[in-house]
Amino acid sequence: MSGSYYLPVREDWLARRSEPALDPDLPIVDPHHHLWERQGWRYLLHELLADLAQGHRVVATVYIQARSMLRAGGPAAFRPVGETEFANGVAAMSASGFYGPTQVCAGIVGHADLTLGAQVREVLEAHLRAGGGRFRGIRHSGSWDADASIRNPAYDPPPGLLGRPEFREGFAELAPLGLSFEAWVYHPQIPDVTALARAFPETRIVLNHVGGPLGIRGYAGRQAEVRAAWHAAMTELASCPNVRVKLGGLGMRINGMGFEQGEEPPSSEALAAAFRPWME
């Protein structure tokens, strides 16, 4: 994947399509969004509020870690707590009612390095203190592929992360604190999530982005093969009662659907047709 891992936001391109909300009275909790400010692009509270004002009734949102507003100093293990402090500040702004009825960042999922083993408990407790009662869990990415050009350089875990003893030692600290785990992996690692869920049946696991089916580089042109492997892995994962799956996140470049290459954004019908095989 050449260039930046993330696509630039093209407001002029996005403006080429507008559709009315399908069910404007349906209450929605957005379970997965980020807030950040990076060089050349910004998506903070006001940008999120602009998107929320497009006709849907979004009553609350859940903030998911994205390496945003980390602490600038102090022990490295505790720097991700800065992101929880930031998200909780946004939540407090939203809770004032000044910005409208949506409870933004009503839930917060942060990051902690679970390979710290049992020592990660201090970091988890710091997140809970910083979260103002909103902190719900940890995301520690296991998204790895042998092709380094597919991997996100911001989250470049070693292969087999979820099965490593030090990771599992840290993972064991989640359930006693009532915390869940957000699993962000590519589809070849779904069996690792299944093994983790079976080893820790008391821990709630949320699989991100439908398991991250890949469709670029060596996976390009192999959709039937990828889907067969993905389907088999997801069927096995479905036997774990402590796992839930987020239905979304299929429009990224790594999925290979090519939406970003169109003259205009895809319609809701086009998105539904493309996503249907991964969600039915």
Model regions: which residues?
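Mid-domain alpha/beta scaffold segments of enzyme catalytic cores
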Residues: 1-177, 199, 217-221, 227-228, ...
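Catalytic pocket-lining loop regions of alpha/beta-barrel enzymes
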Residues: 157-280
